[in-house]
Swiss-Prot record:
Alphabetized UniProt keyword annotations: Cell projection, Cilium, Cytoplasm, Cytoskeleton, Flagellum, Repeat
Name of the protein this chain belongs to: Radial spoke head 14 homolog
Tissue: Expressed in adult cerebellum, spinal cord, spleen, skeletal muscle and some/5 out of 9 rhabdoid tumors. Detected in fetal brain, lung, liver and kidney.
Stated role: Functions as part of axonemal radial spoke complexes that play an important part in the motility of sperm and cilia.
Superkingdom assignment: Eukaryota
Main location (coarse class): cytoplasm
Renumbered ranges of ARM repeats: 16-55, 57-96, 99-137, 139-179, 180-219, 221-260, 262-301, 303-346
Length: 348
C-alpha cells in the first residue's frame, strides 16, 4: 500500500531563484518594493524577474513612470556582485528599446554605469559595454556619452580588455558612433594609436570596426593629421588586400578622408595604394566601390596620382553608365565616377 510522505527537498523543476510576481498592474510596483529590500535574495529575485519583463517596451515605460530607474541606479552600487550583474543586465536590455534609451537619458544612467567600468566581474563589464553600444544607436545617446567625458575611459578600456575580444567589439561599436558626433576628446586620448594597434588584430570584426572608427576620426583635420603622423596609412593600404570585404571597404573609407590633405595623398601613393584601390572598384560591395572611387579621386589631385590613373579612365566611364537595382546607389556611384574622371583629366 502506498504512503504519502512530505519531502524536505524542493521539486526538481522548481527554480529557487525565481520570484512569484504579482498579477497584472501590481507586478512592477511589487518588484519596485523588492528592489529596495534589505534581504539580498529578495533583491536578486526581483532583478531576475525584471530581466524577463524588460524585454517588453510597455513594461519599460511603466517601470520608468513608477521610479524603477532610480532603484536600479542605486543597485549599481550594491556590494553584491550578482546584484550588480543582474542590474546591468536589466539596463542593457532596457537600452535595446527606444523608450529605454529615453529612460537612460532622463535618469542619468550613463554616468552611474561608468563607475562599473573597472568592476572585477567581466559579466558586469560586458553588460555595461552592451548598454552603451545600444544607447549610441541614437545621436542623443552618443552625445550623452561624450558630454559625460567618457570617451577617454572607453579608449583606455579598448586597450586593457585584451582577453575579451567581444568586449573590444562592443567598445569599438560605441566609439564609431561617438566619433561620428565629435572626435575631439578621443583625439586627445591617443585614439589613433590605439586604433592603429587594433587594425593588426587577428579578429576580422575588430579590424573592420577599427578601420570604421578611423574613418570617423579622419573627418576632422586634426584626425587626418594624426593618421598621417602616426603612420597609419601604410597599414590601411595593406588592409586593402584583406580577405574580408568589410575590412577592405572600411580601410578604403578611412583612406578616402585621410588623403584629403597633401601629406595623406603622398603617404598613400608611396604605399602603392592606387593598384589596390583599382582592384576594389570590382568589389561586390557597393560601399567599397564608392569608397575606393572617392579615395582614387583624392589621389588624382596629386600630379603623380593623376598621371598613374590616366590609363584607367575607361574603368570610370564604364561606372558612369552602369545600372543598379537601387536608383540612389546608381546615382551615388555614377556621380563619384564623373568627379573622378574630371579630376583625372584636369589640365593645370
Amino acid at each position: 500500500m502506498a504512503h504519502s510522505q512530505n519531502s524536505l527537498e524542493l521539486p526538481i523543476n522548481i527554480n529557487a531563484t525565481q520570484i512569484t510576481t504579482a498579477y497584472g498592474h501590481r507586478a512592477l510596483p511589487k518588484l519596485k518594493e523588492e528592489l529596495q529590500s534589505e534581504d539580498l535574495q529578495t533583491r536578486q529575485k526581483a532583478l531576475m524577474a525584471l530581466c524577463d519583463l524588460m524585454h517588453d517596451p510597455e513594461c519599460i515605460y511603466k517601470a520608468m513612470n513608477i521610479g524603477c530607474m532610480e532603484n536600479l541606479k542605486a543597485l549599481l552600487k550594491d556590494s553584491n556582485s550578482m546584484v550588480r550583474i543582474k542590474t546591468t543586465e536589466v539596463l542593457h536590455i532596457t537600452a535595446s528599446h527606444s523608450v529605454g534609451r529615453y529612460a537612460f537619458l532622463e535618469h542619468d544612467i550613463v554616468l552611474a554605469l561608468s563607475f562599473l567600468l573597472n568592476d572585477p566581474s567581466p559579466v558586469c563589464r560586458g553588460n555595461l559595454y552592451k548598454a552603451y553600444m545600444q544607447l549610441v544607436q541614437v545621436p542623443r545617446g552618443a552625445q550623452e556619452i561624450i558630454s559625460k567625458g567618457l570617451i577617454s575611459s572607453l579608449v583606455w578600456k579598448l586597450q586593457v580588455e585584451v582577453e575579451e575580444e567581444e568586449f573590444q567589439e562592443f567598445i569599438l561599436d560605441t566609439l564609431v558612433l561617438c566619433l561620428q558626433e565629435d572626435a575631439t576628446e578621443a583625439l586627445g586620448s591617443n585614439v589613433v594609436l590605439v586604433l592603429k594597434q587594433k587594425l593588426l588584430s587577428a579578429n576580422q570584426n575588430i579590424r573592420s570596426k577599427a578601420a570604421r572608427a578611423l574613418l570617423n576620426v579622419s573627418i576632422s583635420r586634426e584626425g587626418k593629421k594624426q593618421v598621417c603622423h602616426f603612420d597609419v596609412i601604410p597599414i590601411l593600404v595593406h588592409l586593402l588586400k584583406d580577405p574580408v570585404e568589410h575590412v577592405k571597404s572600411n580601410a578604403a573609407g578611412a583612406l578616402m578622408f585621410a588623403t584629403v590633405i597633401t601629406e595623406g595623398k603622398y603617404a598613400a601613393l608611396e604605399a602603392q595604394a592606387i593598384g589596390l584601390l583599382l582592384e576594389l572598384l570590382h568589389s561586390p560591395m557597393t560601399i567599397a566601390r564608392l569608397n575606393a572611387t572617392k579615395a582614387l579621386t583624392m589621389l588624382a589631385e596629386a600630379p603623380e596620382g593623376r598621371k598613374a590613373l590616366q590609363t584607367h579612365v575607361p574603368t570610370f566611364r564604364a561606372m558612369e553608365v552602369e545600372t543598379y537595382e537601387k536608383p540612389q546607389v546608381a546615382e551615388a556611384l555614377q556621380r563619384a565616377a564623373r568627379i573622378a574622371i574630371s579630376v583625372i583629366e584636369f589640365k593645370p
